[in-house]
Amino acid sequence: ADDKNPLEECFREADYEEFLEIAKVTVLEASERNDKEDWYANLGPMRLPEKLNEFVQETENGWYFIKYPVKPSEEGKSAGQLYEESLRKSAGQLYQESLGKAHDDIFAYEKRFDEIVDGMDKLPTSMYQAIQERINFKPPLPPKKYAMGAITTFTPYQFQHFSEALTAPVGR
């Protein structure tokens, strides 16, 4: 049986070195890798040209390399400026849409006005009827309280302010 690998034989061709010289490439082959490193896939030798230029992924004129067709109003602008303008336009549209949605939510209900028949005094009267158990007109005075050695009667309003004055810290 022939143990020769046809791929390996390709690299042993008499003209192989000459082809590398013509193409001006360097063949990088990994062997005897560190045990802690793993391969996801072995893609064989890499052929790299001898002369390489650094590829910068981001520059002010980054889109120049991509050669997007641009509108006349966009010509001469940097990638950053074009990006900001596109975001500003999108943000403006989003803002307008959200305002429209909020407007619709607020004003989507029935648009009508009602008039109070027989005068505006009906409004507080009807409110009073709905909450009258919570309103206390002419409440009884609180029981007599001792204040500074004498018995004094206070209205609720007077007592509230008097008790605050008694409990207020010095210098207040």
From Swiss-Prot:
Residue positions binding substrate: 47, 103
GO molecular function, one term: toxin activity
Posttranslational mods: N-glycosylated.
GO cellular component, one term: extracellular region
Entry note: thermal dependence: Optimum temperature is 50 (Cc-LAAOI) and 60 (Cc-LAAOII) degrees Celsius.
Keywords: Antibiotic, Antimicrobial, Cytolysis, Disulfide bond, FAD, Flavoprotein, Glycoprotein, Hemolysis, Hemostasis impairing toxin, Oxidoreductase, Platelet aggregation inhibiting toxin, Secreted, Toxin
Protein name: L-amino acid oxidase
Organism, as annotated: Cerastes cerastes (Horned desert viper)
Lineage summary: Eukaryota, Metazoa, Chordata, Craniata, Vertebrata
